């Protein structure tokens, strides 16, 4: 089974990727994990990515594709894998198609987790984090015992700039602009399936499994 997961920030895509990986016994592969792995191993790709990020630049398709190629050459992907955060563009999607075809493999399904903008804004803008220990809370879903203060060390909680409503909306708009061509790409190939991303992680997993079985 080879799955690709799409979804805006706050849609719970990463959580579903982990649950699906455990359910089907295949690795969950995210671009963030790949970057961190190469950085930790001190590879040439890792050094290149770090230099680009330190300079405030964007990692090119070629570099990302090379990391994916390296990751998919490992034996743990023999039964399949779940990709989270890649591909992000139609060019990357075409590269992945060619890479898989050269190994006699193909994508099983592309799952797009859809969540209304208001729900995403509420979900993300409610996050509060502790600047001291890094603990993360949510004002309604997972509040601290004393509102505004960390349970562990009583430090004042803060809202990250990325989590402010106006910035969440901006990220949503950027995601939509980048992802619509990708969704059209996979829809034209009959691979795209939409999953409602509202509910408990377990409930969404159950819906996802029904979609995969259909």
UniProtKB/Swiss-Prot annotation:
Predominant location: cytoplasm
Domain statement: Consists of three domains, a large central CORE domain and two small peripheral domains, NMPbind and LID, which undergo movements during catalysis. The LID domain closes over the site of phosphoryl transfer upon ATP binding. Assembling and dissambling the active center during each catalytic cycle provides an effective means to prevent ATP hydrolysis. Some bacteria have evolved a zinc-coordinating structure that stabilizes the LID domain.
Reaction(s) the record says it catalyses: AMP + ATP = 2 ADP
Residue ranges crossing the lipid bilayer per the database entry: none
Source taxon at top rank: Bacteria
Subcellular location: Cytoplasm
GO cellular component terms, semicolon-separated: cytoplasm
Residues that bind Zn(2+): 130, 133, 150, 153
Protein's name in the database: Adenylate kinase
GO process terms (BP): AMP salvage
EC number: 2.7.4.3
Cited function: Catalyzes the reversible transfer of the terminal phosphate group between ATP and AMP. Plays an important role in cellular energy homeostasis and in adenine nucleotide metabolism.
Cited SUPFAM superfamilies: P-loop containing nucleoside triphosphate hydrolases
Positions with a binding annotation for AMP: 31, 36, 57-59, 85-88, 92, 160, 171
Cited CDD domains: ADK
Molecular-function GO term, any one: adenylate kinase activity
Region annotation LID: where it falls in the sequence: 126-163
Subunit (UniProt): Monomer.
NMP, as annotated region: 30-59
Keywords for the protein's UniProt record, in alphabetical order: ATP-binding, Cytoplasm, Kinase, Metal-binding, Nucleotide biosynthesis, Nucleotide-binding, Transferase, Zinc
Annotated ATP binding sites: 10-15, 127, 136-137, 199
Pathway involvement of the protein, from the record: Purine metabolism; AMP biosynthesis via salvage pathway; AMP from ADP: step 1/1
Similarity field: Belongs to the adenylate kinase family.
